[in-house]
């Protein structure tokens, strides 16, 4: 398995619709102001956070159970900036829709701009032939409220291509998050 370059990422996005919308360069400024960068980098793609959020709350004082998750544990929010309460988290989604080729697996890492502020971005790998908007998890590890900016970079996707196609892809096995739109809660 080898990591793929900016040239490969551009070709796959432009000719095969792997990333939509796609930014072929690196954007660091918008409307004359500095932003958290997004777009194609040397060996990855910096994804953006959309303006849809689900902010975790303990209003219902329930037990967090990934097999039986209570939707009422979240407050829906739409806006350019999301404030995550101290020691809490929020879910969001990418602005980009992904179509992962059968021979490719991705790994996604949070951007250091957020990590250096105690905000951790977690995303699981995008498996071969998975497609959809990516659900993002932002953890505020600090004792203070934390800001997340919609429309700006939040994590980097690295693309790895195998020497041979997998026997069974995510699509083949009917993965539960295939084709997801919006912020998707846990499913079992």
UniProtKB/Swiss-Prot annotation:
Keywords (A to Z) from UniProt: Hydrolase, Nucleotide metabolism, Nucleotide-binding
A Pfam family the protein falls into: DCD
InterPro entries per record: dCTP_deaminase (IPR011962), dUTPase-like_sf (IPR036157), dUTPase_trimeric (IPR033704)
Binding site for dCTP: 111-116, 135-137, 156, 170, 180
Active-site annotation: 137
Keyword Hydrolase attributed: yes
EC number(s) from the headed UniProt entry: 3.5.4.13
Pathway: Pyrimidine metabolism; dUMP biosynthesis; dUMP from dCTP (dUTP route): step 1/2
GO biological processes: dUMP biosynthetic process; dUTP biosynthetic process; nucleobase-containing small molecule interconversion
Gene Ontology molecular-function annotations: dCTP deaminase activity; nucleotide binding
Domain of life the protein comes from: Bacteria
Keyword Transferase: no
Reaction catalysis annotation: dCTP + H2O + H(+) = dUTP + NH4(+)
Family per record: Belongs to the dCTP deaminase family.
Function (record text): Catalyzes the deamination of dCTP to dUTP.
Assembly behavior: Homotrimer.
Protein name: dCTP deaminase
Lineage: Bacteria, Pseudomonadati, Pseudomonadota, Betaproteobacteria, Burkholderiales
Gene (UniProt): dcd
């Amino acid at each position: 398995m080898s990591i793929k370059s900016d040239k490969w990422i551009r070709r796959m996005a432009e000719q095969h619709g792997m990333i939509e919308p796609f930014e072929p360069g690196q954007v660091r400024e918008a409307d004359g102001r500095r932003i958290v960068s997004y777009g194609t980098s040397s060996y990855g793609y910096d994804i953006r956070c959309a303006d849809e959020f689900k902010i975790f709350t303990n209003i219902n004082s329930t037990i967090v159970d990934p097999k039986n998750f209570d939707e009422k544990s979240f407050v829906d929010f739409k806006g350019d900036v999301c404030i995550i309460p101290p020691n809490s988290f929020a879910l969001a989604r990418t602005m980009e829709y992904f179509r992962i080729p059968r021979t490719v697996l991705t790994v996604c890492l949070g951007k250091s701009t957020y990590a250096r502020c105690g905000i951790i971005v977690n995303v699981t790998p995008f498996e071969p032939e998975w497609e959809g908007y990516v659900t993002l998890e932002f953890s505020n590890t600090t004792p203070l409220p934390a800001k997340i900016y919609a429309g700006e970079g939040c994590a980097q996707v690295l693309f790895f291509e195998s020497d041979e196609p997998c026997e069974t892809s995510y699509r083949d096995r009917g993965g539960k998050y295939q084709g997801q739109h919006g912020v998707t809660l846990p499913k079992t």
